[in-house]
C-alpha cells in the first residue's frame, strides 16, 4: 500500500515543532484535516476513499454546466472523435474539516490553472481580500485563477506574441513595485549621482512575465554581472505565500543540478526596507517562521497591509522564452522534436527520483535557453509541486531523503494543475506521480503534430490536444474520465510522420488507467529506444 498525502503529527500552532513538522509541504487544508476526527487520522486510506470518485463527480459536472463553451474556429480540422453525448452524473466535492469561509479567496497566477482542492480558507484577519479576487465556492470548490465559469478554448489562427516592456515602464505600470520601500537596495539600478550608495544586489532590466501573484524580471547580478531571472512575489495573501513556499521547498530540496530543470540561485525576503536571505527550515528566522505560519493558518501573520513584504526568487535566465513560443515560431523539425522528447523525459525522471511531483506540467512552464548553441529545455514553475517525504518510524520526523519513497505509490488528493493537461485521476482527486506522465504525453503529442488551441482569456496560442464533442472541445483527461474505453487516434493528422514506436509510447503515456502508464524511469528508457529507431 502506498503512502498517502496524509497529515503529520499534531503540534501547538506557532511553536517550533509545529513549523518543523508542517513546513514539509502541507497545505492549510491538509493541516485542518489532521485536526479532524481520530478515525480519519488513524486510517489515511479510508480518508482518501471517502474523497473518491462517488463523492467527486457532482462537482465537476456542476462546474462544467456553468462553463461557457465555444465553437472551434473556421477551418479547424480536428478528427479526434469524442465520447458519446448525454448528461453526466453529478459530482459533489466534500472536504473533511472544512473551514468556514469569511471572504473571497485571492486569485491564482494563470488562467486555466487549478490549485489545492481543499476546503475554503478563512479570510485574512488583518488584511481584507482584494476586491477583484475570485470567490471560493460554498462547497469548498477548487480555487483557481479563472472565473467560476471556466471558458473553453477554440482552435483558431495564431496570435502574435507579446513584446517585452522596459523595466521603467514595467515599474510605472506596477503599483506594487512602486510602493516597495526596500526595492532600491535590492533590485533597482543605481541612481545617478549615488556614488556613495551601496551597489544593488540585482538591477532590473525588463519585465518578462506577469501573473496574479507576481512579476518576473530579467536582471543583472550586481557583483558577477550575470543575467538572472528575478520573480517578485508580494506576500500580502496566504495564497501567494503558499505557492511561493511550495516552489521554494521543491527547488531547495534538490541536492544536485540537472541541465533540464531550472536552476534556483537564492530567495530573499524583504520587509520594511530590509532584505534577508532565506534558507529552508531556518527556525532561527522569525520572518521565515511567520511566513510558514501565514501559509498554514491561512491568515496574515507578517503584519499590517501598510507593511509590504516581498519574496524575491533568483533563478537562471532562459532567453528563449517558453516551449509554446519556441515551437510555434519555427518550422517543424523532427530532430528538434526528438531532442525535446529526450530532455523532457530526463527531467521528469530526475524530479521523480528526487521525490518531486510537478503537478503542473505544460508548455508555459517549460523554458528554453540557447546559450550553448543548441536549444536546452528547462522545467520551471514549481508552485503546485509536491515533495513526497517518507513516513519515518514513530517518534521521528519524515526524511525527504528517504530512498524508500516511491512517488508512484504516494497518493495525492489535491486536484490541481491546468485542465487541458490534467490526467483523468486528477479530476477525481486521487492520483500519484503518474499524472506527470499523462501531462507529458499531451505536451509531446501536441508538439509533434502542432495541435494548438487559444486560451479564451489571454488569447494566447497554446500547444495542447483535446477531444471534440460536437461543437465543444474537451480536455483529453476529462473525456477519458467519462469514457475510459475511448480510443485516442494518434496521430490525428494524416500527413504527420510518426513511427510506430512513438505512437505506442504516446498511447501508453495517455492510458486512462495510471497503472497502464510507464513510470518516469521506464519512460526514459523507452524514449531512448524509440527515438533511436525513428
Curated annotation (Swiss-Prot):
Grouped into one coarse class, the protein's main location is nucleus
Annotated InterPro entries:
CC_SR_Kinase, Kinase-like_dom_sf, Prot_kinase_dom, Protein_kinase_ATP_BS, Ser/Thr_kinase_AS
**Disordered: annotated segments:** 32-176
Supply the SUPFAM superfamilies for this chain.
Protein kinase-like (PK-like) (SSF56112)
Q: Which GO terms describe its cellular component?
A: cytoplasm; nuclear body; nucleolus; nucleoplasm; nucleus
As its record notes, the protein acts as a catalyst of: L-seryl-[protein] + ATP = O-phospho-L-seryl-[protein] + ADP + H(+); L-threonyl-[protein] + ATP = O-phospho-L-threonyl-[protein] + ADP + H(+)
Judging by the UniProt lineage, the source's domain of life is Eukaryota
Q: Where is the composition biased (Low complexity)?
A: 39-65, 166-176
A Gene Ontology molecular function term for this protein is: protein serine/threonine kinase activity
Read off the PROSITE patterns from this record. Answer: PROTEIN_KINASE_ATP, PROTEIN_KINASE_DOM, PROTEIN_KINASE_ST
- Entry's EC annotation: 2.7.11.1
Q: Where does ATP bind?
A: 208-216, 231
Cellular localisation = Nucleus; Nucleus, Nucleolus; Cytoplasm
- Please describe the post-translational modifications of this protein: Autophosphorylated.
Protein family? Belongs to the protein kinase superfamily. Ser/Thr protein kinase family.
Can you say what this protein is called? Serine/threonine-protein kinase 35
Amino acid at each position: 500500500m502506498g503512502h498517502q498525502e496524509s497529515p503529520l503529527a499534531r503540534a501547538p500552532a506557532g511553536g517550533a515543532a509545529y513549523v518543523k513538522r508542517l513546513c514539509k509541504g502541507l497545505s492549510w487544508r491538509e493541516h485542518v484535516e489532521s485536526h479532524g476526527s481520530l478515525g480519519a487520522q488513524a486510517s489515511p486510506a479510508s480518508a482518501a476513499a471517502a474523497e473518491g470518485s462517488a463523492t467527486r463527480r457532482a462537482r465537476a459536472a456542476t462546474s462544467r454546466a456553468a462553463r461557457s463553451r465555444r465553437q472551434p474556429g473556421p477551418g479547424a480540422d480536428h478528427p479526434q472523435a469524442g465520447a458519446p453525448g448525454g448528461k453526466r452524473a453529478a459530482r459533489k466535492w466534500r472536504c473533511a474539516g472544512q473551514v468556514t469561509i469569511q471572504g473571497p479567496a485571492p486569485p491564482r497566477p494563470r488562467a486555466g490553472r487549478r490549485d489545492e482542492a481543499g476546503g475554503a480558507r478563512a479570510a485574512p484577519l488583518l488584511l481584507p481580500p482584494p476586491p477583484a479576487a475570485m470567490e471560493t465556492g460554498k462547497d469548498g470548490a477548487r480555487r483557481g485563477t479563472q472565473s467560476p465559469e471556466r471558458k473553453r478554448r477554440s482552435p483558431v489562427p495564431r496570435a502574435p506574441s507579446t513584446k517585452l516592456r522596459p523595466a521603467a515602464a514595467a515599474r510605472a505600470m506596477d503599483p506594487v513595485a512602486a510602493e516597495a520601500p526596500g526595492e532600491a537596495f535590492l533590485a533597482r539600478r543605481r541612481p545617478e549621482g549615488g556614488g556613495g550608495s551601496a551597489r544593488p544586489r540585482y538591477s532590473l532590466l525588463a519585465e518578462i512575465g506577469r501573473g496574479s501573484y507576481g512579476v518576473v524580471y530579467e536582471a543583472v547580478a550586481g557583483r558577477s554581472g550575470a543575467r538572472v531571472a528575478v520573480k517578485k512575489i508580494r506576500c500580502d495573501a496566504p495564497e501567494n505565500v503558499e505557492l511561493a513556499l511550495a516552489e521554494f521547498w521543491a527547488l531547495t530540496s534538490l541536492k544536485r543540478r540537472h541541465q533540464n530543470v531550472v536552476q534556483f540561485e537564492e530567495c530573499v525576503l524583504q520587509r520594511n526596507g530590509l532584505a534577508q536571505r532565506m534558507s529552508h527550515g531556518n527556525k532561527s528566522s522569525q520572518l521565515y517562521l511567520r511566513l510558514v505560519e501565514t501559509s498554514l493558518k491561512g491568515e496574515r501573520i507578517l503584519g499590517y497591509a501598510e507593511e509590504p513584504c516581498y519574496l524575491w526568487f533568483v533563478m537562471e535566465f532562459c532567453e528563449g522564452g517558453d516551449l509554446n513560443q519556441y515551437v510555434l515560431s519555427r518550422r517543424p523539425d523532427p530532430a528538434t522534436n526528438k531532442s525535446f522528447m529526450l530532455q523532457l523525459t530526463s527531467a521528469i525522471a530526475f524530479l521523480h527520483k528526487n521525490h518531486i511531483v510537478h503537478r503542473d506540467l505544460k508548455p508555459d512552464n517549460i523554458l528554453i535557453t540557447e546559450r550553448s548553441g543548441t536549444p536546452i529545455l528547462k522545467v520551471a514553475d514549481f508552485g503546485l509541486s509536491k515533495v513526497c517525504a517518507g513516513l519515518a518510524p514513530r517518534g521521528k520526523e519524515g526524511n525527504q531523503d528517504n530512498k524508500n519513497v516511491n512517488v508512484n505509490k504516494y497518493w495525492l488528493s489535491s486536484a490541481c494543475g491546468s485542465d487541458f493537461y490534467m490526467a483523468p485521476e486528477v479530476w477525481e482527486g486521487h492520483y500519484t506521480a503518474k499524472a506527470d506522465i499523462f501531462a507529458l504525453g499531451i505536451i509531446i503529442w501536441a508538439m509533434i503534430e502542432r495541435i494548438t488551441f487559444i486560451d479564451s482569456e489571454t488569447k494566447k496560442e497554446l500547444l495542447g490536444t483535446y477531444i471534440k464533442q460536437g461543437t465543444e472541445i474537451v480536455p483529453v483527461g476529462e473525456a477519458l474520465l467519462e469514457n475510459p474505453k475511448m480510443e485516442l487516434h494518434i496521430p490525428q493528422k494524416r500527413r504527420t510522420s510518426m513511427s510506430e514506436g512513438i505512437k505506442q509510447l504516446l498511447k501508453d503515456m495517455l492510458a486512462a488507467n495510471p497503472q497502464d502508464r510507464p513510470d518516469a524511469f521506464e519512460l526514459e528508457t523507452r524514449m531512448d529506444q524509440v527515438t533511436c529507431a525513428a
